[in-house]
């Protein structure tokens, strides 16, 4: 048995750890077409690695993370190439590609993760910007009108890329805002790869985001289990809500009567 002084032993451990770090799969080395696809966002990367650290010992974490990275690249190798890359606002934090990254994590770590954990990951990506907008009150006509204009602007972006096919109903004073998607790349991806079971965890954030604006989302169907994803949005004090109580269906979707 060879005995090393503690200082020499610490140096050896540090060098070994450094070698392990050098063996990490770098994001820049992932093989996918970056002319049409984008890498998952840094916040998404942080979320996934945090969950891996929660479930796996330190000696396994880099291996698991590399599996997630490779699965992401594999998915993109057989995925549509017309989503606009970095130019499309839907491909930012919490958007289409982050959803694909989370689904990559789910396929690799399905044995240890949970529905609520996936739901939480998407919330942590989407909700921070809505928390900064807590001063918005959808019960007030002015804010409701400004929200409507924001949805109309979003539709123009959708019309440019034809990723989320969006229709916005005309604005009516005193009535809820309504718009719908008849196409959703995230839902399309989940259907293609047999991952629809986890889509409710990614879709439910829409309800949580509206609640931060003193608003309520009323939804009856999604592109995952129907032909559209509907958004009826009103203030959280609107009498309209009494006729549309919220519930969770068997799949885990938050929806309304």
Predicted regions and their residues:
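Short, hydrophobic/π-rich interface segment
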Residues: 167-225
């Amino acid at each position: 048995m060879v005995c090393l002084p503690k200082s020499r032993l610490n140096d050896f451990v540090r060098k070994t750890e450094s070698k392990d770090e050098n063996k990490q799969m770098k994001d820049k080395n992932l093989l996918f077409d970056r002319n049409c696809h984008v890498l998952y966002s840094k916040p998404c990367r942080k979320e996934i690695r945090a969950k891996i650290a929660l479930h796996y010992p330190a000696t396994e974490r880099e291996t698991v993370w590399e599996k997630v990275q490779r699965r992401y690249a594999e998915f993109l190798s057989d995925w549509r190439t017309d989503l606009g890359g970095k130019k499309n606002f839907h491909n930012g934090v919490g958007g289409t590609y982050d959803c694909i990254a989370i689904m990559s994590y789910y396929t690799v770590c399905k044995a240890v993760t949970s529905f609520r954990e996936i739901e939480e990951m998407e919330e942590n990506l989407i909700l921070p910007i809505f928390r900064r907008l807590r001063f918005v009150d959808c019960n007030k006509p002015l804010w409701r009108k400004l929200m409507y204009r924001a949805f109309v602007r979003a539709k123009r972006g959708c019309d440019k890329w034809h990723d989320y096919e969006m229709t916005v109903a005309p604005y009516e004073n005193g009535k809820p805002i309504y718009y719908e998607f008849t196409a959703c790349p995230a839902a399309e991806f989940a259907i293609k790869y047999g991952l629809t079971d986890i889509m409710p965890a990614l879709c439910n954030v829409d309800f949580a985001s509206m609640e931060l604006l003193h608003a309520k989302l009323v939804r009856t169907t999604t592109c995952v289990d129907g032909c559209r994803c509907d958004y009826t949005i009103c203030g959280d004090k609107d009498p309209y809500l009494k006729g549309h109580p919220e519930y969770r269906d068997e799949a885990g979707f938050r929806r309304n009567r």
